[in-house]
């Protein structure tokens, strides 16, 4: 990323909810790790994750919650969905889910829709398709219609697509278009193709 685009991305990350998407090993978590380190020290941050991929070396008020799968020896089972529900009751300024893979999407979406600044990663083939993937996961646990959930996705102000550890696209979400029944997105960055 050039300096201006990097600064724009950091500014948008600090001010509104961000969804980072891409394929396997595309750099989603690497980017999220870097962006969360730019958050101010006086901001309370909750990170919910399945694996220890997101860490901090510097931030004084970043709390990490990890999923705990049930085993044959214990009936205790805290998946990302349960952690996300608990996260909604905590007094935090910023809520992060390392990777959305299931019903926790509904609680991430609810947090963002009520004004909580959130960030997450999700597997999706492009930035403009990422909201559909979050809605697919949210449908696992939701009584909302698909259309209602898509409307709620307008609370994610920034959508980023990663590929080969490069930011390929950044979209700004302009809101829900009731007439077309879709999210209005504006492309604010597209990377130049790499030359070989």
Predicted regions and their residues:
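P-loop NTP-binding catalytic core
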Residues: 1-15
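Switch/coupling sub-region of P-loop NTPases
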Residues: 17-24, 34-152, 164
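Conserved glycine(s) of the Walker
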Residues: 27-28
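Hydrophobic positions on the alpha1 helix immediately C-terminal to the Walker A/P-loop
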Residues: 31
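Phosphate-binding/switch region of NTP-binding enzymes
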Residues: 148-178
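Conserved small/polar residues in nucleotide/adenosyl-binding loops
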Residues: 188-196
């Amino acid at each position: 990323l050039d300096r201006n685009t990097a600064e724009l991305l950091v500014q948008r990350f600090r001010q509104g909810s961000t969804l980072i998407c891409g394929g396997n090993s595309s750099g989603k978590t690497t980017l999220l790790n870097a962006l969360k380190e730019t958050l101010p020290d006086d901001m309370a941050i909750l990170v919910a994750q399945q694996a220890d991929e997101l860490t901090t070396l510097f931030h004084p008020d970043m709390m990490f919650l990890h999923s705990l799968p049930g085993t044959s020896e214990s009936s205790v089972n805290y998946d990302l969905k349960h952690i996300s529900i608990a996260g909604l009751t905590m007094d935090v300024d910023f809520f992060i889910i390392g990777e959305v893979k299931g019903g926790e999407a509904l609680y991430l979406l609810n947090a963002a829709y009520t004004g909580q600044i959130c960030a997450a990663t999700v597997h999706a083939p492009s930035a403009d398709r990422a909201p559909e993937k979050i809605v697919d996961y949210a449908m696992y646990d939701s009584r909302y219609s698909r259309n209602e959930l898509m409307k709620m996705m307008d609370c994610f102000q920034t959508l980023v697509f990663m590929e080969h550890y490069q930011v390929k696209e950044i979209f700004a979400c302009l809101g829900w278009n009731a007439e077309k029944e879709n999210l209005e997105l504006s492309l604010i960055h597209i990377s130049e193709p790499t030359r070989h």
